Swiss-Prot record:
Record-level GO cellular component terms: extracellular region
Disulfide bonds: none
Organism expressing this protein natively: Pithecopus hypochondrialis (Orange-legged leaf frog)
Name of this protein: Phylloseptin-H8
Keywords assigned by UniProt, alphabetized: Amidation, Amphibian defense peptide, Antimicrobial, Cleavage on pair of basic residues, Secreted, Signal
Length: 66
């Protein structure tokens, strides 16, 4: 009976450790995805902030040529 008890505790312990590792990896993956989304948004904001100056430069170039 003691052997079964020890085996059961061992199985439960290993299952708990495995579950903990999986949750940690999932959390890290979610953090990386969130960081990537934030980087994409900041790049988009930078591009949109440059857009008016690019348009005004193109308009002035067209006026000089036309």
């Amino acid at each position: 009976m003691a052997f079964l008890k020890k085996s059961l505790f061992l199985v439960l312990f290993l299952g708990l450790v495995s579950l903990s590792i999986c949750e940690e990896e999932k959390r890290e993956t979610e953090e990386e995805e969130n960081d990537q989304e934030e980087d994409d948004k900041s790049e988009e904001k930078r591009f949109l902030s440059l857009l008016p100056s690019l348009v005004s430069g193109a308009v002035s170039l067209v006026k000089k040529l036309g």
